[in-house]
Amino acid sequence: REMSVNSHLNAVIFSESFNEQYEKTLPIISNYYSEIGANKPLYMAIKGLNNVNLNNQQKHIVKETIRGFELSGVGLEGKASERYKAIQEQLSILSNQFSKNVLQATNSWKKIVSLDDLKGYGKDELLKIKDSEKYVLNLQIPVYIDLMTYAENRSLREEIYLAYISRASDVGITPKKFDNQTVMNEILELRFEMAKLLGLSNYAEYSVQSKMVESPQMVIDFLENLIKLSLPQAKKELNELEAFAGHPLKPWDLMFYSEKLKQKIFDFKSSDLKPFFPEKSVFNGLFSTIESLYGINLEEISEESYHPDVRVIKIESKD
């Protein structure tokens, strides 16, 4: 639980100093979970629960726990076991580095624009990017979606689209020092080696062990069938959108013209929904649903947190 808190904080209030301390915990946590996963007495004890009279939910938990042990290398011995632990530790470090690079690349890009550049924006969209007397664009997802949806300036849409999709790579305009290519290659190699240690052909086979599908081929077949069924409709809708726009469309045009077409057909804008979903009503509805589903009470309380926008919720059982 403590690791989940640390991981969350590292993502939402990232700083070099916090991340430096967070990275020091990764090998410790990785080794902790590796030791549990390789604990044969614990594994055998849980396997013994198969002979106990359990309900369906309990049987499922036992089954998933046993599978978790087996995917954690509990059956490995000697050097193979040690290598598996080393791979797990290195993967935890590389995964953090990957996320860190994406985050820093995202935060590195900013562009000051004028009000004339933002034709098509409403008051709410302008407020998100107003900084003193300037308007500052960035690659955070709310700003990105607003620009793709409402900005009439096509060249500006193209610029931010290319900046967004090329983050943490060796192309585009974000700093090359955040390029994730080497990190991804190392992750791929280690995942392949990890799968081979467990007697699997590749990491895809490892990944599907804990999913509903039985094999990577089932995933491929599903996706190919999905393409076959959806592609004709996708082409039809693209043709309709291009006919409406009056010219061939690029990726940075799709959200913009989709919104325009929706406004024309339905006389409706996405922002028209906002008055019907005030913040207080949305939270009340969310709390009511959660309380009903899980038999708990939720109460917002005044408590110091890591950011002024964070709300602290007290959770109690109805029992």
What do the PLM-derived regions correspond to, one by one?
Residues 1-121:
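N-terminal helix-rich structural modules
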Residues 5-16, 150-171, 210:
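Short, charge-rich amphipathic alpha-helices with coiled-coil/heptad character
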Residues 22-23, 179, 222-225:
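Membrane-interfacial loop-to-helix junctions in multi-pass inner-membrane proteins
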Residues 47-64, 138-159, 191, 196:
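Acidic, low-complexity proline/glycine-rich segments
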Residues 57, 61-62, 90-93, 100, ...:
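Active-site-proximal, well-structured secondary-structure segments within enzyme catalytic domains
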Residues 73-87, 167-189, 193-206, 220:
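A conserved hydrophobic secondary-structure block that centers on an alpha-helix together
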Residues 122-123, 129, 142-153, 157, ...:
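Catalytic nucleotidyl-transfer cores of nucleotide-processing enzymes
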